């Protein structure tokens, strides 16, 4: 009865102070009926990133017996018989082969560990693939950074080229403006020269008309002189002056005087015209100088304003280029920050994924351990139930044997009945313990279900996070593709602009090449104009000479007129004298008709006087001939000047034609300049469109950065939620583990109480059953055998401890093994 009762009370060793256990492996040693059963459970967990090792070991021994070294048996005989006629109680100890055969190395199989290792290998492969993907992404990011740097360098080179192009365009615009001003000056000078030529032509026509009038007057005076000459010649031939001759002389004299007066008037008008011409020329020169100075001042002001505008435009362009460079730098910084944040987010997410996978693996291992512990609890409950059944059967047998053997000892029977009642109470306690174990099993099942649910939630969160990561990666790829497209479009635009700039360069070179002969022609035209001006000046000098000659001729004509007046006066005097002489001669002829001898003297005197008059007439004729020669020289000179004027007109017409050709070329150049200005406007429009596209791309980048920021915030919030959930699950698991530890402690207290009760029962049994020492000796032998098995198990456990200590090293597991209650147990004295 005592053996059965001692076999029916299993022992639960107290756990260590660290208390957190996880069951992974199980070893149950069963003996036949009456043999002690030892259940050894042990676990280990291979954690990731500093996870602790949790081990629970429980050795259940029925009774406490003296220590016996392993491999030795008791000194007493194997079989002990207690004979009492007419009954015989035979006790056979269990064979060591059965005990040893129960414990096998196959029970220490690591199939679950292999499956866990497979999962861990899979996770490692996944992590390696993720790390490879991260490495690829990093390399891509580096390549993108290199491409961005190359693009930046290319853009800077293109900017420098654009600045050079802008500088050259400014130079070409300046040259074009200078050409325009020169062409305008040429046009103005041309118009001014045309007006001058028209005015000179009008003045020339006026002078020519006045000269023609003067020539006509001179010719009329010459005719009158010739008429006087003829009349004087007639008078010579006739030698007698009639009234008609006198009248003709007087008439010719009057006509000559009229012609001379008209000649004087024409000379005066010519002098007035020449004076007016000189005054006009002086005033025109002054006006031209004043207009040229005003034009120069206006041109200087316009050049100053244009240069100021160009400086302002260049400053604006420089500011715009600086703003573009700053925007591109900000974009590069934002892109680098985005790439860095994406890399950090990737690393953070990968670390979180690894931690989640490690936690999932740990939770799976914990779930498996819980399942194993549940199965162990079930097996333990079944073993306890079987032991209870065996104990009941054994108790019934013992009762029957004791009733048959000890009928006389009623007191012992009553005591045994009381003991049986106590055993029934213990059985009830065991039933309660089984119920509690079942409740704990149900709680573990609920916990397992909750853990499975949490695992599913975590997997869903991981899937969502992976989707977000893929979305972010896709968004980054789309952004990079857009940036590449924008960069390609900018490069294409730059190529187009360079091609257009080269075309502009060629056109400018062609225009310059065409401008050189135009400049030569313009210089030739200027030289011709200067030659014309010099010829005009020469003509003016000639006109001055002619004026001086005309003045001389006027003076000579005045002298001739004075001489003619003198001659007229002398003629009048002579006529009067002749009349007087004729009258005197008549009177003398009448008075001295008789004096015929005096007539030849008078004739000689008259002949001498006539000879003198003829000499005077010849002198006058000579003077008239000289005057006619002078007039013919003047006519020849005027004709020569007319030829020169015609040559000048022809040259002027040729210069006008050349000026027309030059104006046509200038118009073509102006058209080309207008085309270039239109192309410049188109370039400005293209640049404005490019700036608008850049601004739109900047806005898109800002939107994408905002979206990335919102996504990063969402990721951070999701990660924080996952962390909170994981912490909550950890806290929940810790609380459950603490509750389990508390329950284990309660069970240990109950076991200690049962142990104390058993010790009291043993004392009472020893005090009451001293007579049954033989049976007690048998029981002691059996207990020694069980103790030997326990010691062998302890040695095996010690071997396992040393092996696990060698495997796991120093740590909480070794401290737990050293603090195990099995080692501290000492054999009874």
Curated annotation (Swiss-Prot):
GO cellular component, one term: centriole
UniProt cross-link Glycyl lysine isopeptide (Lys-Gly) (interchain with G-Cter in SUMO2), position: 138
Location (main, coarse): cytoplasm
Keyword vocabulary terms for this entry: Cell projection, Cilium, Coiled coil, Cytoplasm, Cytoskeleton, Developmental protein, Differentiation, Flagellum, Isopeptide bond, Microtubule, Phosphoprotein, Spermatogenesis, Ubl conjugation
Superkingdom, taxonomy of origin: Eukaryota
Coiled coil: 144-217, 245-423, 461-798
GO molecular function: small GTPase binding; structural molecule activity
Region annotation (Disordered) ranges: 392-413
InterPro entries assigned: Odf2-rel
Subcellular location: Cytoplasm, Cytoskeleton, Microtubule organizing center, Centrosome; Cell projection, Cilium; Cytoplasm, Cytoskeleton, Microtubule organizing center, Centrosome, Centriole; Cytoplasm, Cytoskeleton, Spindle pole
Residues with Phosphoserine modification: 73-74, 95, 106, 109, 115, 129, 139, 261, 632
Modifications the protein undergoes after translation, according to the UniProt entry: Tyrosine phosphorylated. Phosphorylated by TSSK4 on Ser-95.
Swiss-Prot/TrEMBL GO biological process terms: cell differentiation; centriole-centriole cohesion; cilium organization; protein localization; regulation of cilium assembly; spermatogenesis
Modification Phosphothreonine occurs at: 92, 110, 231
Expressed in which tissues: Testis-specific (at protein level). Highly expressed in cytoplasm of step 2 round spermatids. Detected in the middle piece and extends to about half the principal piece of the sperm tails.
UniProt entry tagged with the keyword Coiled coil: yes
Region Interaction with BBOF1: start-end pairs: 537-701
Subunit structure and binding partners: Self-associates. Associates with microtubules and forms a fibrillar structure partially linked to the microtubule network. Interacts via its C-terminus with PLK1. Interacts with ODF1. Interacts with MARK4; the interaction is required for localization of ODF2 to centrioles. Interacts with TSSK4. Interacts with AKNA. Interacts with QRICH2. Interacts with CFAP58. Interacts with BBOF1. Interacts with CCDC38. Interacts with CCDC42.
Function: Seems to be a major component of sperm tail outer dense fibers (ODF). ODFs are filamentous structures located on the outside of the axoneme in the midpiece and principal piece of the mammalian sperm tail and may help to maintain the passive elastic structures and elastic recoil of the sperm tail. May have a modulating influence on sperm motility. Functions as a general scaffold protein that is specifically localized at the distal/subdistal appendages of mother centrioles. Component of the centrosome matrix required for the localization of PLK1 and NIN to the centrosomes.
Family statement drawn from the similarity comment of this UniProt entry: Belongs to the ODF2 family.
Protein name per UniProt: Outer dense fiber protein 2
Naturally occurring in which organism (per UniProt): Homo sapiens
Gene that this sequence comes from: ODF2
